[in-house]
């Protein structure tokens, strides 16, 4: 299940060209995994790319979940307890199936609020069913560091 973020109307404010948007700070080249790939491949890819999670898609390219270090830690503990090898299990057995997303035209403040409200580390950035990128907590901090002056505008 994919949950797309649309901020409440009462909290929306008029957007100007000078506002700092998610699309300006998201990572555009997103590493994704197919839901049928092995958990071992996921562990290796996350480790080698120094990332903590990634979107999971089905064979049609539709977002169906997110796999994270936390999901993998649960798998490692279960596999040790039951003495089961890790390489034969697919991503779909361990991924988080309820995915919270955000749209590219939301501000970094909308994203920061959403990170705090939902306690997530990353959000796929979506336009309809298409993954445009991914934004993380560290991307929000990067954006905040680049803001000049006290008015929170570029």
Q: PLM ranges: what are they?
A:
Residues 1-154:
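Tandem CBS (Cystathionine beta-synthase) repeat/Bateman regulatory domains
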